UniProtKB/Swiss-Prot annotation:
Proregion residues excised on maturation: 21-44
Record's comment describing the protein's domains: The presence of a 'disulfide through disulfide knot' structurally defines this protein as a knottin.
Record's keyword annotation contains Calcium: no
Species in which this protein is naturally found: Lycosa singoriensis
Similarity comment text for this entry: Belongs to the neurotoxin 19 (CSTX) family. 01 subfamily.
Gene Ontology cellular-component terms listed: extracellular region
GO molecular function ontology, one term from the record: toxin activity
Record's protein name: U3-lycotoxin-Ls1d
Disulfide bonds: 48-63, 55-72, 62-87, 74-85
Signal peptide: 1-20
Cell location: Secreted
Keywords: Disulfide bond, Knottin, Secreted, Signal, Toxin
Length: 115
């Protein structure tokens, strides 16, 4: 009986140690993957096209605003045959960002009142 109990304790100890090692390996892999994604995002962010600049060379290169990514909008100027593309923020997204800013400001005021 003592042998079975000792063997069980040894088995549980080895199992918990091996699972802890596997979790550490997974955590390390997740951290490495996250860091590589952040580096890629930073590199990509440097190449974005600012608002109201020409985006005809790459229509997916518009920069992000605070919450949303700007959209490459193309149009024909009055009296012209050439298409012009610029990065712009759609109006509905502009209004949503303004509402979010007001909600943040209001949230800060309520914290001061009820703090």
């Amino acid at each position: 009986m003592k042998f079975v109990l000792l063997f069980g304790v040894l088995l549980v100890t080895l199992f918990s140690y091996s699972s802890a090692e596997m979790l550490d390996d997974f955590d390390q892999a997740d951290e490495d993957e996250l860091l590589s994604l952040i580096e890629k995002e930073e590199a990509r962010a440097k190449e974005c096209t600012p608002r109201f600049y020409d985006c005809s060379h790459d229509r997916h290169s518009c920069c992000r605003s605070e919450l949303f990514k700007d959209v490459c909008t193309c149009f024909y100027p009055e009296g012209g045959d050439n298409e012009v593309c610029t990065c712009q923020q759609p109006k509905h997204l502009k209004y949503m960002e303004k509402a979010a800013d007001k909600a943040k400001k209001f949230g800060g005021k309520t914290k001061k009142w009820f703090g």
